[in-house]
């Protein structure tokens, strides 16, 4: 389930009616711990439509760390206080650039809600970052000094970069970064997190940083995905 209808959303291909129950999620985490797994990520849809269940799972599985990829529009002070209380949940907030570019894909007013969410998270001293889908159109913006300085000022400690994945029959293939843009990104991310001249934020490129983990981490090497139907998949992006 999700409260937005973003253009080009890969998760929308799963449909909008499937959801794992609290009992399903609890069972997955319990079984995962038996296998030695203590780090869990929530994607969506929008995970924060299930705020109560997420906090309940954080409480029960206090020996685990949880991370949610969220559009940020449902973050409020009450939820920040709950995050503070449980202490084992962090967030990555989706952002595509500044207001005009971001709201073009995500909807009018979403950028302002994200900025407000960041202010709340920062004021509560919580750990959060951004999840950025870079395309052929926004790659220069989301790697610019101006943009990075802004999210650092807002309190972001890290940023994920994912290149646009054209999913579905109506996918906008022209948004896929070119070979030259991918090469630019490879070097730019290393500049951003460089010890000399870098930014006060940890930048990660999900695809281009594969060399640090010996290639793709999917298929149970270090990671697998369980979709909203309960199916175990090698990777969230394969469907």
Describe these PLM feature segments.
Residues 12-16, 98-101, 166-169:
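A short, flexible beta-alpha/helix-coil linker loop
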Residues 1-22, 236:
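Canonical Radical SAM [4Fe-4S] cluster-binding loop centered on the CxxxCxxC motif
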Residues 1-8, 38-42, 230:
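N-terminal pre-triad scaffold of radical SAM enzymes
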Residues 25-42, 50-162:
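Radical SAM/AdoMet-radical enzyme domain recognition
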Residues 103-215, 219, 228-233, 237:
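Radical SAM enzyme [4Fe-4S]-AdoMet core and its adjacent flexible, acidic
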């Amino acid at each position: 389930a999700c409260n937005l209808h973003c253009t080009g959303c890969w998760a929308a291909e799963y449909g909008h009616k499937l959801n794992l129950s609290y009992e399903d999620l609890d069972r997955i985490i319990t079984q995962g711990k038996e296998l030695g797994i203590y780090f869990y990520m929530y994607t969506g849809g929008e995970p924060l439509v299930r705020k109560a269940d997420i906090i309940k799972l954080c409480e029960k599985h206090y020996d685990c760390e949880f991370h949610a990829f969220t559009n940020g529009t449902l973050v409020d002070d009450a939820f920040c206080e709950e995050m503070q209380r449980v202490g084992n949940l962090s967030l990555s907030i989706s952002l595509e650039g500044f207001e005009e570019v971001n709201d073009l894909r995500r909807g009018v007013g979403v950028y302002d809600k994200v900025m407000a969410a960041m202010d709340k998270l920062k004021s509560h001293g919580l750990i959060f970052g951004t999840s950025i889908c870079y395309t052929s159109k926004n790659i220069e913006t989301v790697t610019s000094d101006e943009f990075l300085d802004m999210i650092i000022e807002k309190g972001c400690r890290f940023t994920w970069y994912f290149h646009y994945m054209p999913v579905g029959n109506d996918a906008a293939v022209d948004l896929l970064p070119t070979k030259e843009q991918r090469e630019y990104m490879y070097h730019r991310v290393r500049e951003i997190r460089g010890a000399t001249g870098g930014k006060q934020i940890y930048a990660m490129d999900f695809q281009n940083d594969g060399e640090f983990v010996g290639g793709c981490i999917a298929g149970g090497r270090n990671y697998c995905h369980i979709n909203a139907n309960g199916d175990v998949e090698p990777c969230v992006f394969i469907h």
